[in-house]
Structure formats: structure tokens, C-alpha cells
From Swiss-Prot:
Residues 69-78 have a biased composition (Acidic residues). ATP-dependent RNA helicase involved in 40S ribosomal subunit biogenesis. Required for the processing and cleavage of 35S pre-rRNA at sites A0, A1, and A2, leading to mature 18S rRNA. Pfam families: DEAD (PF00270), Helicase_C (PF00271). A motif (DEAD box) lies at residues 269-272. SMART domains: DEXDc, HELICc. GO terms for biological process: endonucleolytic cleavage in 5'-ETS of tricistronic rRNA transcript (SSU-rRNA, 5.8S rRNA, LSU-rRNA); endonucleolytic cleavage in ITS1 to separate SSU-rRNA from 5.8S rRNA and LSU-rRNA from tricistronic rRNA transcript (SSU-rRNA, 5.8S rRNA, LSU-rRNA); endonucleolytic cleavage to generate mature 5'-end of SSU-rRNA from (SSU-rRNA, 5.8S rRNA, LSU-rRNA); snoRNA localization. Residues 53-83, 503-550 are annotated as: Disordered. This is ATP-dependent RNA helicase ROK1. Its EC number is 3.6.4.13. PROSITE patterns: HELICASE_ATP_BIND_1, HELICASE_CTER, Q_MOTIF. Interacts with the U3 snoRNA and is associated with the 90S and 40S pre-ribosomes.
């Protein structure tokens, strides 16, 4: 059997004869049994190299049991964990590194089956969870689901890729299923707000999976749906749950084509962004239109600064606060590294060195601070014959969706982007995140590198910095320390002075002015400029000559 052919199937990676770099496929060390018979090798390897799990794979449990002749003992199936006492809860929270504060805190759950006995979880909802491959809850789900099902307001902070979306979708769907008024076009009862269209689409896809087989109307307020609602082609009251970005929803509210008066469950995802400048007024307007006296609010994010938390607390009723790990720490599955490149030219050289040394293992996401710089790096890496594309705010939603789809399917190996996809968008198999430009805050850093190391899988994040980044890099070091990644930076960086509040604000508000991305020598640039000037001068002389002739 041709092993290389098998290894190259699952991810659909397009290869070129011109590419000589050794792009390593993902490691096989996680295989349960390397001695499986030849007929099982294909399916196992296909699953390994299917970076983003876009294909359905059957369980290998039975096959492993039959073929693992060297194993004398097979582990007994562990019964679902149930939490029935404060002592059980304390042990679980210690294990999960969960910090929970508030009055009358419900016990966490130890398994999804635990929800059946305690909250009569809808059987079809549980079946949909299992069919989607969700067999046991994550730490944030352990806490957030019972808190929400008890009808309590919630502020939740957990690392990127830790399952926050399911943590609010499961109780949202369950609550609405239980409170079905059996009235046609009753009105929107569940509302989910997210800062970006990409994240809204992803949430809607998860919601669609959870509600499969149930008589529940769900919608995402896309441009097309908003137009139909605003033109009264569709009645918005038909929807039980609506997912939307703030501005589009506000536009429909002002047109009086969407009413939020029946909303019982409000979820604000990426709370730190939606309570930040530029979004906070929109968020406040949405909240003012949610007039139901029984309204329950949930707020989720990977980072929640103190100022944002204070604002959130002020609009909530007796909330419970859940922190998994540290408030501004990255997932412990991400290996973080700071690389000093000296100057801007050194960044491109650093990428090319990573390629030569075999550290450039796709899929990869590269973040830059501006659209102009993202475009420039895209063209530079195209010259290196890399399988690369770029996504930014100037591209249409349709173009961005297509690029994301191609990246997930493996047609694109390297995705260059701005912060437009830094939040929430789930790429399950990203091996490496490169911060070509240092992010302007600890929150932005955590969200960027959170595109890797998701769902408990290992990932790596590399951040390039120059002499101009002396202030911007300090918050990054603090996140790395909280995440246990002290080995990822040089010791002399510890001696940098602590930033004042004003310095932090200044770094966050003002982008560092950087040189143009290019490795073209200075003398070549001068020659190009001289040539362009000569061409322009020739054109002017020709135009003047034509004018004189006339």
C-alpha cells in the first residue's frame, strides 16, 4: 500500500512541483494503536490529516478492540459523572480551575447525562449533541449550563476554543423548548448578538445542529433576510431564536419590523468587544428594546477587562460570575513564543527561515494590523509560491465566506488577515498563528492566538516584534506569564517597566507606524522609482506635444 498517497488524502492540500519546502503533515503520535491492521490505516490517517474535521468519521472503538491483539486488558466504560453535593462541586472546580462567585450558585454538571435527571434535558437535543461528537461538557459548560437553566444572569470568561458557544446554546434551546407558548408568530424569544458576521454565521450553524429535528424557527439576520423583513415579505415574529450583529438589528428595530419585547433570553457573545468603544452605544440600544420583565442575560468572552465587567454588572440582576483559568490568559494548549526581528525587514526573513527549518506547518493564520499591510504580505508570500490567500474588511462577505470555506477544506494553506476573524471563528485544526504585527492589547492577543489550540488540541503562536514595539509587547508578556509560557521569551524582557494606564490606552488607540512590507533592496526601489518617473515624464511630453500640434 502507498502510505504517502493515504497521508495526502484527507486534507485536500493542493501541491505544486515548484514547492520544494518540506511541509510536514500532522503528527500521528495520538493514534491509539500504531499496530492496527493495514485495512484500518486508511480511515485512521484520513481522520488525522482532515485538519478541520469537515468529513464524517466512524468510531474506531470496535475495530481497535478486535485488532489490538497485544492488549490483554480493555478499560471498562466509565459511567457518566454526576455532581450531587457541594464537595463534588468543589473537587470538580479545583480540577477545572474554575472560579465561581455570586449568591446561591447552582451545582455544576459532570456530564450531559447529568442534565437529564436535573433539568429534564430534551432527548432530541441530547441526541443532536452526541451525533455532533460532543460527548462530555467542557469546564465552562459544566458551570454555565446549569446557571442559565436556573434562570440566573451570567458573566462568563473562558479561554478561546473552550466551548463557550455550546455553553449558551444548550440552555437557550432547552429553555425555549420548555416554554413553548404554542402560539403561531409569538415573537422572538431568544436573541444572540455577536460583533462580526463571520462569528454570527458560525453560531447559527451550531444552533442549526442543536435544533435539528425540533419544531423551532431559527434565523440569522443576514443582509438578505433583513431586506425581506424590512420590506415585510417575512414576518420576524415567526422566529423563536435570532442571531445578529448589532447594527443590522438596530436598523430593523428603527424600521419597526423587528420587536424585542418578547425576548426572554439574551446572549451577548464577545462581551469585551460589544462593550468597547464603537459598539457600546449599539449594545445599549438593543438592551433598551428588550423590555420583557423576565429577561435573562448571559455574557461570554475569552477576556473581560475590569471596566467592561463593571458595565456588565450594572445592567444585570444578581449575576453569577464564572472564570475558567485567568481572565486574560490564553489556553494552556497553546505554545507561545516571542521573536525579536530587529526591524520590519527582519519579519519576512523570519518567516522564510521558519519555512527552511520546517517550522511552517499548515494550516497557518498570519495577523497584521492593517488592510494595506495584509495585502502587501499576501503579494510577498505569493512570490514565494506559497498556497496563500487574504481576508480583510474590504472584501465582501461572500468573498470572505468563500476564503474561509477554502481554508477549512485545505485548498488554502496560509490565511493572511487583519483582526476581522480574530474573534470566535472556529478553525479546529490550525497548527500555527503568527502575529506579524504585535496586537495593540492583551485582549486582542488572546483572541488572535485563540484561533489555534482549540478543543484541547495543541497549537503554536509566534509573535514578531521590533524595537518600535517596546510598549506594545509588555501586555503580551503578561499573558504569556499567566499562561505558563515564560520559556517563550528572553529574560531581558522581564526588566521592561510596567505600563501606566495612560500608556496602555495610548498603545490601544494608536497603531505603530511601520515601514512598507518588502524585501526589495533600497537601490532596486530607487531604480523602480526613477523608471516610473521617466515613464510619467515621457507621457507628459507626449501629451504636451499633442496639445501644441492641435
Amino acid at each position: 500500500m502507498d502510505i504517502f498517497r493515504i497521508l495526502s488524502r484527507g486534507a485536500s492540500l493542493k501541491k505544486s512541483k515548484d514547492i520544494t519546502t518540506d511541509y510536514a503533515v500532522p503528527s500521528r503520535k495520538q493514534f491509539v494503536n500504531e499496530k492496527q491492521k493495514e485495512e484500518n490505516l486508511k480511515s485512521v490517517v484520513d481522520k488525522e490529516v482532515d485538519f478541520f474535521h469537515t468529513k464524517k468519521h466512524t468510531s474506531h472503538k470496535e475495530t481497535e478492540k478486535k485488532n489490538d491483539e497485544g492488549e490483554d486488558e480493555i478499560e471498562d466504560e466509565v459511567p457518566p459523572l454526576t455532581i450531587s453535593s457541594d464537595d463534588d462541586a468543589r473537587k470538580l472546580r479545583k480540577l477545572n480551575k474554575s472560579k465561581v462567585s455570586g449568591e446561591d450558585i447552582p451545582l455544576p454538571i459532570g456530564s450531559f447525562e447529568d442534565l437529564i435527571g436535573r433539568y429534564k434535558l430534551d432527548k432530541k437535543l441530547l441526541s443532536n449533541l452526541i451525533d455532533a461528537g460532543f460527548t462530555e461538557p467542557t469546564p465552562i459548560q459544566d458551570e454555565a449550563i446549569p446557571i442559565s437553566l436556573e434562570g440566573r444572569d451570567l458573566i462568563a470568561c473562558a479561554p478561546t476554543g473552550s466551548g463557550k458557544t455550546l455553553a449558551f446554546l444548550i440552555p437557550l434551546v432547552q429553555t425555549i423548548l420548555q416554554s413553548n407558548p404554542n402560539v403561531k408568530n409569538y415573537g422572538i424569544r431568544g436573541l444572540i448578538i455577536s460583533p462580526t458576521n463571520e462569528l454570527a454565521v458560525q453560531i447559527f450553524q451550531e444552533l442549526n445542529t442543536m435544533t435539528k429535528g425540533k419544531k423551532m424557527k431559527i434565523g440569522i439576520l443576514s443582509k438578505q433576510l433583513a431586506n425581506k423583513i424590512n420590506n415585510k415579505i417575512i414576518n420576524s415574529s415567526k422566529y423563536d431564536i435570532l442571531v445578529s450583529t448589532p447594527l443590522r438589528l438596530i436598523d430593523s428595530i428603527k424600521n419597526e419590523t423587528i420587536s424585542l419585547s418578547k425576548v426572554e433570553q439574551l446572549v451577548i457573545d464577545e462581551t469585551d468587544k460589544l462593550f468597547d468603544q464603537g459598539f457600546v452605544e449599539q449594545t445599549d440600544e438593543i438592551l433598551s428594546n428588550c423590555t420583557n420583565t423576565k429577561l435573562r442575560k448571559s455574557m461570554f468572552s475569552a477576556t473581560i477587562p475590569s471596566g467592561v465587567e463593571e458595565m456588565a454588572q450594572s445592567i444585570m440582576k444578581d449575576p453569577i460570575r464564572v472564570i475558567i483559568g485567568h481572565k486574560e490568559a490564553a489556553s494552556n494548549t497553546i505554545e507561545q513564543k516571542l521573536v525579536f526581528t530587529g526591524n520590519e525587514e527582519g519579519k519576512l526573513l523570519a518567516i522564510r527561515q521558519m519555512i527552511q527549518q520546517g517550522e511552517f506547518k499548515p494550516p497557518i493564520i498570519i495577523f497584521l494590523q492593517s488592510i494595506t499591510r495584509a495585502k502587501a504580505l499576501f503579494h510577498e508570500l505569493l512570490y514565494d509560491r506559497l498556497n496563500v490567500d487574504v481576508i480583510h474588511a474590504e472584501r465582501t462577505p461572500k468573498q470572505r465566506d468563500e476564503v474561509i470555506k477554502r481554508f477549512k477544506s485545505g485548498d488554502i494553506w496560509v490565511l493572511i488577515t487583519t483582526d476581522v476573524i480574530a474573534r470566535g471563528v472556529d478553525f479546529k485544526g490550525v497548527n500555527l498563528v503568527i502575529n506579524y504585527d504585535v496586537p495593540q492589547s492583551a485582549q486582542a492577543y488572546v483572541h488572535r492566538i485563540g484561533r489555534t489550540g482549540r478543543g484541547g488540541k495543541a497549537g503554536k503562536a509566534v509573535t514578531f516584534f521590533t524595537k518600535e514595539d517596546d510598549k506594545a509587547v509588555k501586555p503580551i508578556i503578561n499573558v504569556m506569564k499567566q499562561s505558563g509560557c515564560e520559556s517563550g521569551y528572553s529574560g531581558w524582557l522581564e526588566d521592561m517597566h510596567k505600563l501606566s494606564k495612560n500608556e496602555k490606552k495610548d498603545v490601544k488607540k494608536h497603531e505603530i507606524k511601520r515601514k512598507q512590507i518588502s524585501t526589495v533592496p533600497k537601490i532596486m526601489k530607487q531604480k523602480r522609482k526613477q523608471r516610473e518617473e521617466m515613464i510619467d515624464a515621457s507621457k507628459r511630453r507626449k501629451q504636451e506635444s499633442q496639445s501644441n500640434t492641435e
